[in-house]
Amino acid sequence: MPKSILHNEPPALPGRGFIRLRMDLSYDGTMFAGWASQPKLRTVQSEVEKALQIAFHLKAPVTTIVGGRTDAGVHARGQVIHADVPESVLNEDFGKIAYSLNGLLDADVRVLDLIQAPYGFDARFAAIARRYSYSFSNGAPDPLYRNFVVPSWRKLDVDAMNSASAQLLGLNDFTAFCKRTQFGTSIRTLNQFDWRVTDFGVMATLEADAFCYSMVRSIVGCLISVGEGKQDTDYPKRVLDTKTRQDEVVTMPAHGLVLEKITYAPEEELMARQEVTRAKRDSAEIDN
């Protein structure tokens, strides 16, 4: 079982006099410097927080917590955030507020849904799965899709990539595919990783309980070497087993990546899920 607990995290529940809102978002990440607020840069978080403050007529700034933090250029079809706001907003029509938010936001961000979150909901810590897709075009992409697909100049062997991807499924230490961070862990459960042919090329779909920094783009980069015939189907598993970040693993461009969906625990299990997620995982889980 996990032992140590992550510190300096936001409270599990809203403070006295506040309620928690859940907002579902979609955005084109092309012109954003990622999700997280950064001084003098346009980010999704800063744009959404400004719009929330205006739409709800709040004097104090709004702070949002995101379910899946995205890097510069990464897109989202199913992002989820929460924000704690004064109880007075309960007098508002959330449908009208969502409409107002979409009027305040630029066209590359859209509010898909806005509701009062159930007890125990936390956009980050109550999640049980996150799903991403990564798309390649066959050769030069259609100009209308160039911001969402990465060109592949060689025919990709989808069967070989699926064979290699299957070897990475389950609970593993994905350090070999994650950029180093001071905190956290690289132990993840990869539930889905498959490839399919699309109208424009090839798409990978990955779903895990969580992903560490650059994990999706690095795994995809590793698998492309298999699809192009440069490596055998056992190569990604050999890289995984090193448990060391490999310089030879290419991190693919951001614009081919889309956060598709975040799945949450049932309402009656939200608080329990927070406790599980906040616990830092260690190698003993894999050994057992």
Give the location of each predicted region.
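Structured-RNA-binding interfaces characteristic of tRNA pseudouridine synthases
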Residues: P2-N288
